[in-house]
Regions:
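Flexible, charged surface loops at secondary-structure boundaries
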Residues: 1-2, 44-48, 74-75, 95-98
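Flexible, membrane-associating and regulatory peripheral segments of lipid-active enzymes
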Residues: 1-6, 77, 97, 139-143
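Active-site catalytic motif of lipid deacylating hydrolases and related acyltransferases
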Residues: 2-49, 125-130
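A conserved short beta-strand
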Residues: 73-87
Length: 143
């Protein structure tokens, strides 16, 4: 599925041309999913679906819930990119992932994150290493 728009969620520090950039927000963890989903809804005239949701670090654990919120709003998710992630707990949302998941490991990743990449591979997710900005742009450009 071709990607319509990239959404950079709070905590991301990457530059992707044409992305919906919500990275400047810093909602508390207990309100993270709701606030980000509302911000995406508020900006819905600025982007096209399906979305490529980019989550970084501990925020990556919110991916299943943010994806569910987008489906509830009738917005298609074309993929997830988790950068140096804390991986989501299996079964947090029963039908997640509903789109391809790519894990990006940066040069700043610590040993715990690198070992978590093994868990991502075991789940059948693509794992890439390198510069997140260029990798995200490349993923978004896939047909």
């Amino acid at each position: 599925m071709a990607i319509g728009s990239v959404v950079l969620t709070p905590g991301t520090v990457y530059t992707v041309p044409g992305a919906l950039d919500l990275s400047g927000a810093s909602p508390p963890d207990s309100e993270w999913t709701a606030r980000v989903a509302l911000a995406i809804t508020a900006a819905s005239g600025e982007f096209a679906a399906p979305l490529l949701l980019v989550l970084t670090g501990a925020a990556a654990a919110h991916a299943p819930h943010l994806g569910f919120a987008q489906r509830s709003a009738r917005r298609a998710v074309g993929g997830y990119v988790l950068v140096d992630p804390v991986l989501p707990r299996p079964g947090a949302v029963s039908d997640w992932p509903d789109a391809p998941v790519t894990v990006v490991i940066t040069s700043d990743a610590d040993d715990d994150i690198r070992s978590a990449a093994l868990g991502a591979r075991l789940r059948g997710w693509e794992v890439l290493e390198g510069d997140p900005s260029s990798l995200i742009a490349g993923i978004a450009a896939r047909p």
